[in-house]
């Protein structure tokens, strides 16, 4: 997964 997607989930 892209870092941006991960941050969005957090």
From Swiss-Prot:
GO terms for cellular component: extracellular region; membrane; other organism cell membrane. The keyword Secreted applies. Keywords: Amidation, Membrane, Secreted, Target cell membrane, Target membrane. It comes from the Eukaryota. Expressed by the venom gland. Belongs to the MCD family. This is Venom peptide 4. It comes from Orancistrocerus drewseni.
